[in-house]
Structures are given as C-alpha cells and as structure tokens.
Amino acid sequence: MSKEERLAKDITHALGGSQNISNIIHCMTRVRIKVHNDAKVNYDELKSINGVLGVVEDERIQVVVGPGIVNKVAKLMADQSGATLAEETTENQSYKSQAEKRAYEHKKQFQSQRKQSKWNKVLKSIANIFIPLIPAFIGAGLIGGIAAILSNLLTAGSISGQWIQQIVTVLNVIKDGMLFYLAIFTGINSAKVFGATPGLGGVIGGTTLLTGITDENPIKNIFTGEHLAAGQGGIIGVIFAVWLLSMVEKRLHKIIPNSIDIIVTPTITLLLIGLLTIFIIMPLAGFVSDGLVYVINWIIGVGGIFSGFIIGAFFLPLVMLGLHHIFTPIHIELINQTGSTYLLPIAAMAGAGQVGAAIALWVRCGKNKELRNTLKGALPVGFLGIGEPLIYGVTLPLGRPFFTACIGGGVGGAVIGGIGHIGATAVGPSGISLLPLIANNMYLGYIVGLLAAYAGGFIFTYFFGTTKEMRNPE
C-alpha cells in the first residue's frame, strides 16, 4: 500500500467512514471534506495520523497533507467513498512541509478564536462558489494574454502570417469558453452551495445571457424602458437569483407529491425564477453592479497614490480575516464591463510587501534557525503569489513583521496607483504569477510596483520589524 493510499484510508476512517463523507475538494495543500455528521468525526485520531500536518475544524474539515500528494489523496478518498470531488487549485511543489505545518498550526489557533457570524457564512459561500473556478480563471486568462500579445505583434508588424491570425482566433475561442459562459458556471456552483439542483442554477445563469434576443425583438427593462442587455447584472444577479431558486425549489419539494415532483418542481421553479430574473433581478442588479464599478474606478482614479496605499496596506489583514473573497465578484464585474480590474494589481502588492518583509527576516535573523527553516519553504511560493504560509507561519505569529509587511504593501500599492491604468484581464494569483495577466502592456509599471513593495517591506521590517528575541533566540 502506497503512502497516499494509506493516508486516504486512515483519513476516511477518522472521518467516520466513507458513508459520512458528502463531498471533497482540495487546494494546494489541504483536503477539504464536507461530512454528513460532524459527531462521527474522531478529531484526535485524525490529528495523530502519520502524514497529516494539521487539521482545521471548520464548516469544511481541512486536513493538511502538504503539496504534491494532496490531489492524489483527495482522489483516492473520493474513489473510496464515492463522494464527489472538485479541485480548488493545484500545485506541484516539493519543499515546504515545515512551513505548511507551522502555518496551519497558527491558522487553526487564529480561526478558533474567531466567532462564526452570518457575515462569515456569506464570505464562505462566496468563496465556495468561486474557488473551484480559479484554475479556469487562470488558464483562460493566460491563454487570453497570449492571444493579446500575438495580436499586438501582428498589429505592430513584428510578425505576420494568416496562420498566426488563426492561432489568435482559436486561443480567443478557448478563452471565451470560460469567460463568455461564466454566468452558467457561477449558477451551477451557486446552486451547489445553496443546496439547489446544479442544473437549474446553470439554466438561470444561462438565462441572463438572453440567448436569441436581437435588436429587432428586444426585452425591455421595465424600470427604464431601455433594451435589456445580455449579462446585465452580472454574476451578482446570478448569485442572488440562484439563492432565491434554492428556497423555492426546497419549498416545492416539501409540498409537491412525490409522484409528480420530478416534473412539476423544476418546471415551476425555472419559470418563476426565470421571469423574476429577467424582469426584476437583472435590471436591479445591473444598477448595483454599474454603480459599484463606477465607484471603485473613481476611487482608484481620483485617489491615485493615496487610494493605492490604503488598498495595498489593508488588503493583507483582509486576507488574514478571510474577507478578501468578497472582492472576487467585484473583480469579475470590473473585467466584464471595462476589460480589466485595476483593483487586483494594487491588492497584489500586499503579498509583495510580505515577501519583502520575509527577505528582511532572513537577513536580520540569521541565528534563528527555526525561522529560517520556515522561510525556506514559505518564501519561494510567496514570490509566486501564494501568501498563506508566510501569513500564518511567519509574519502573523511574530507580530511586528505583519505590520511592516502591510506598510510595504501600501508602498507598492501607492506606486501602482500613482502610475495608473495598471489592470489585470483575469482573476488569478498575485506576485510574479500575475504578470502575464496585466492588461494594455503595462508590464513594466507592475514590475516597478512589485519592486517597490519588496523594498518597502524589506526596509521597514529590517529597521523596525524585529526584536532581540527574533534575532538571537535562546
């Protein structure tokens, strides 16, 4: 029996057996399991399993097994239990087990002190809707970026050839396979989160695309009299509509006789919510999303350096609190309406400031072997925009470096805001990994912002972010 097979078997047993597992997803280092009955889970046994680096007791039980094997363990658990398996993000790293273990120990301690509120539940719902789509966002965004680069080279005359134009066309078709039908994917995932039938959620998402509607035969906005536009209201409207759908469907399941439930319930649900979506939700959500996009672009455009500093400095605490997920639908709305999100490159500076702080700790605390071992695993992935090991394993537990990292993020954000017009064409990772997604060839500006954040985090941490105990541990 391989290590992965043993881990999967032992974890499944500690979770109360295969019958107690509802569904499984995994991120870069964790297997996240939704169980039917939490009382059947033996947490002591789960934590004692050889190969389990940590356990986070949350709405979804998070079992930390480390990078590289997490996808194998998750798949084996799904095969053994028959549970559905979805993938959040994937990673193929081989060195940072100590950093991951330290990070999740502190993360568990931090999360255990937080009171679960309705707001936290809303944030978890938003996260569960969009996290499974992150690989698709990244892949489609990068493909679109390649197509844009080739198109620019064609326009400039640097390259030529009909076959290159065909490649650009094909790449854009692949990209649009994700971005054009995002409302459908959002509807399906929203239905899963809200406990509705996924297919019905997808139909409601597809309804917002107004397929078949032409200028000669439009649907009018009942509030303004103007033609209703395809996708109006964006994913904000889709999420709200599917939430209503879930309540209607659940109610109908209770009152419709079993003999006709399979026919009557989906028909009535789709008809009712479909009409409500087209005539009420789309116009109102469109008003909200348009206003949101306008306000954010105005704040970034008018505020410039000041707005950039505030966003860059305060985004890391939002990540720490789990509040950063609320920005995902905002990024998507910005991209849908303007072609790029100016918010993401500024927010990405928070992670860069933390990298600068980590480099300063490496230089300043050379005698702290434990800290250096943690940094060996956490720092390389920090450059690529994966900041959790640094947050929970290094800066947050130490205290001071977390605040100096925030200042570094503010410095980078101020530079990005000062340069202006630096946007990202897709939602993706931060750090160096975001570079291919930068819009309008503003790559140099983004690099300058990154370097400024690195420098800011380094300088403030080097001079103000360490203590004698950090530098010379006993």
Curated annotation (Swiss-Prot):
Ordered alphabetically, the record's keywords are: Cell membrane, Kinase, Membrane, Phosphotransferase system, Sugar transport, Transferase, Transmembrane, Transmembrane helix, Transport
Give the metabolic or biological pathway.
Cell wall biogenesis; peptidoglycan recycling
Task: Look up keyword Cell membrane and say if it applies.
Answer: yes
- Please name the InterPro entries in this protein's record: Glu_permease_IIB, PTrfase_EIIB_Cys, PTS_EIIC, PTS_EIIC_1, PTS_IIB_1, PTS_Sugar-Specific_Components
* A GO CC annotation given for this chain: plasma membrane
Source organism superkingdom: Bacteria
Q: Which residues form the active site?
A: 27
Q: Which biological process annotations from GO are given for this protein?
A: peptidoglycan turnover; phosphoenolpyruvate-dependent sugar phosphotransferase system
EC number assigned by the record: 2.7.1.-
Please list every transmembrane segment annotated in the UniProt record, as residue ranges: 129-149, 167-187, 193-213, 228-248, 268-288, 299-319, 343-363, 378-398, 402-422, 444-464
Gene Ontology MF term list: kinase activity; protein-N(PI)-phosphohistidine-sugar phosphotransferase activity; protein-phosphocysteine-N-acetylmuramate phosphotransferase system transporter activity
**Is the Transport keyword given for this protein?**
yes
Which reactions fall under this protein's catalytic activity?
N-acetyl-beta-D-muramate-(1->4)-N-acetyl-D-glucosamine(out) + N(pros)-phospho-L-histidyl-[protein] = 6-phospho-N-acetyl-beta-D-muramate-(1->4)-N-acetyl-D-glucosamine(in) + L-histidyl-[protein]
Q: What is known of its domains?
A: The EIIB domain is phosphorylated by phospho-EIIA on a cysteinyl or histidyl residue, depending on the transported sugar. Then, it transfers the phosphoryl group to the sugar substrate concomitantly with the sugar uptake processed by the EIIC domain. The EIIC domain forms the PTS system translocation channel and contains the specific substrate-binding site.
Query: What's the protein called, per UniProt?
Result: PTS system MurNAc-GlcNAc-specific EIIBC component
